[in-house]
A protein has these predicted regions:
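Accessory "access/gating" subregions that flank catalytic or transport cores
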Residues: 162-239
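Alpha-helical support elements that line or immediately flank enzyme active sites
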Residues: 1-11, 239
Length: 239
C-alpha cells in the first residue's frame, strides 16, 4: 500500500486533498496491519526501501495534522480484480477531482494499477529449475554444485553477479538495522493491548553476563527474533 500510494502521488502533482478507500480483506486487516499508516507515508512521498524508521512517527504526525488525507474502509465490497484493492482519488483546492486510480496489493511487494498486467517477478527463466527440496538436492548433485552455487546460477539468469551481491548486501543491511533498532527501542507497541517491548530488556540482561554459555547464545537468537517481531508490529522496516 505504501508503494501504491507513492505511485499514485506521481499521477496527482499539486493535489490539495486525497481520499483513499480500502476494499475487502484489505479493509478488514487494514488497521491491524498498519495499512492506513503505510498509505499516509506513501502520500507523504516515502518509500519502504528508503524511509528512515526513526522518522516514521514524526512523518505520520505531520501527515495527520494536515487533515488533507481521508481513508475509508469498505468492508462489504471487493474490487473485481483482487481482494486487496485500493481506490485513490485526488482533488484540487476547489474540490474538483484531478485523478482517480485503483491499485492492488498482490503480495510479495508487488502492486498493479487498474487493468495493467501483473508485474513479472522475474525477467527470465531459471537455468536450473526445481520445485521441491528433494528436486533441489537432486539438481545440485546432478550439476555438481552446492545449493548456494545453484541458486547463484539461477539468480544470474536475470541479474549480474555484482547486482545479486549488491541486493544481498541491501537485504542483510536491512535485517541488521531491524535487529539493532528492535534491541535499542523501548516503549509500548502500537495497538490497544499496550504490549511492552521485550527485546531491549533481554539485550540488557544478556549484556550484563560475563562468560556466555551455549544457552546464552540461544537466548541472543531469541532476543534477535523478538526484536524483529516487535519492529514488524511497530511498522518498522523488515525483510
Amino acid at each position: 500500500p505504501m508503494k501504491a500510494a507513492r505511485a499514485f502521488l506521481e499521477s496527482a502533482p499539486g493535489a490539495a486533498r486525497f481520499h483513499v478507500t480500502l476494499f475487502g480483506s484489505l479493509a478488514w486487516t487494514g488497521k491491524g496491519h498498519g495499512t492506513d499508516s503505510a498509505i499516509l507515508l506513501g502520500l507523504a512521498g516515502q518509500e519502504p526501501e528508503t524511509i528512515d524508521p526513526d522518522a516514521i512517527d514524526e512523518i505520520l504526525a505531520e501527515a495527520r495534522a494536515t487533515g488533507i488525507i481521508d481513508i475509508d474502509f469498505n468492508y462489504d465490497r471487493e474490487l473485481e480484480r483482487h481482494t486487496n484493492g485500493m481506490r485513490f482519488a485526488a482533488f484540487d483546492e476547489n474540490g474538483d477531482a484531478v485523478a482517480e486510480e485503483d491499485w492492488y496489493s498482490l503480495g510479495g511487494g508487488f502492486i498493479a494499477r487498474g487493468d495493467e498486467p501483473e508485474p513479472a517477478s522475474r525477467a527470465g527463466e531459471p537455468r536450473i529449475a526445481f520445485t521441491t527440496s528433494e528436486s533441489l538436492l537432486e539438481a545440485a548433485a546432478d550439476n555438481n554444485l552446492s545449493i548456494a552455487e545453484l541458486v547463484m546460477r539461477n539468480e544470474t539468469a536475470w541479474l549480474s553477479e555484482a547486482e545479486v551481491d549488491a541486493g544481498l548486501d541491501r537485504i542483510w543491511s536491512a535485517m541488521q538495522s531491524c535487529i539493532d533498532r528492535g534491541l535499542r527501542t523501548d516503549g509500548i507497541l502500537p495497538g490497544s493491548l499496550s504490549v511492552s517491548r521485550r527485546a531491549p530488556k533481554l539485550r540488557r540482561a544478556l549484556s550484563k553476563k560475563g562468560e556466555q554459555s551455549a544457552i546464552d547464545a540461544m537466548e541472543w537468537v531469541n532476543a534477535w527474533a523478538i526484536a524483529v517481531n516487535e519492529e514488524n508490529a511497530a511498522g518498522g522496516r523488515v525483510v
